[in-house]
Design a protein with these regions (language model features):
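Radical SAM enzyme [4Fe-4S]-AdoMet core and its adjacent flexible, acidic
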Residues: 40, 44-179
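Short, electropositive, low-hydrophobicity segments enriched in small/polar residues
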Residues: 20, 45, 201-204
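Membrane-interface junctions of multi-pass transporters
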Residues: 188-204
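Conserved SAM/AdoMet-binding glycine-rich loop
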Residues: 1-41
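Short, solvent-exposed coil/turn elements at secondary-structure transition points
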Residues: 16, 119-121, 188, 202
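Hydrophobic pocket-lining residues within nucleotide cofactor-binding pockets
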Residues: 17-19, 86, 118, 199
Length: 204
């Protein structure tokens, strides 16, 4: 891109657990400017929904990583989307969660919020998991009562007139997954049509 005088930037979706400030600085030098990190509510709920493989909690490590970046990086050219997947058992604690966000992140415009309901996207096998799914009425209630949290320039772009156009249609958009697979779409991961090769195998 530099040789051809083309602008380049990248974004990553990460659980944030290993996103230390030192790792962030290395990524920033590589023009990774957009990050999506999931925080599923306060510690008690997040640590029940998003645990390590060995069952260890993750909330404190992720929050401390985010705060280290927030407090030490002065660049305005980065964006953090804090995604929250609301399950039924979170709906009674939204106010408390908002107070937490206000305390640590709402004073920094680089941090945006993206709220979704937990749902079945085709991989759920047990009824126990289905019991935490929210309904469309729950999402409607969430948006109507917390509009000021939900609406920001990120969600406006996502749900605006152009937001419904799949970014896989863009000629200059590619996905590189954790295994080095090169794809266009971040959702249709099993389709061979969505697979262009592998770094180090088909591409240097």
């Amino acid at each position: 891109c530099k040789k051809n005088k083309k602008a380049y930037n990248a974004g990553i979706t990460t659980n944030g657990y290993n996103l230390t400030y030192e790792i962030f600085k290395k990524l920033k030098k590589l023009h990774v400017t957009e990050y999506q990190v999931t925080i599923d509510g306060l510690a008690s709920i997040h640590n029940a929904q998003r645990v390590m493989a060995d069952g260890a909690p993750t909330f404190d490590v992720i929050i401390n990583n985010l705060l280290a970046i927030k407090n030490n990086c002065k660049s305005s050219a980065i964006t953090f989307v804090l995604r929250t997947n609301f399950s039924k058992n979170m709906l009674n604690n939204v106010d408390e969660f908002c107070k937490f966000l206000d305390k640590y992140f709402s004073n920094d415009k680089r941090f945006k919020y993206f709220w979704q309901m937990v749902g079945d996207y085709g991989y759920v096998k047990t009824e126990e998991v289905r019991n935490i799914f929210g309904q469309s009425k729950d999402y409607k209630w969430l948006i109507e009562n917390y509009t000021e949290r939900f609406v920001n320039d990120y969600t406006q772009a996502l749900y605006g007139p152009d937001g419904g156009v799949c970014y896989a249609l863009k000629r200059n958009q590619l996905l590189i997954d954790a295994a080095g697979e090169i794809r266009k779409c971040t959702c249709d991961l099993e389709s061979e049509m969505n697979h262009f090769g592998t770094i180090g195998v088909n591409f240097d």
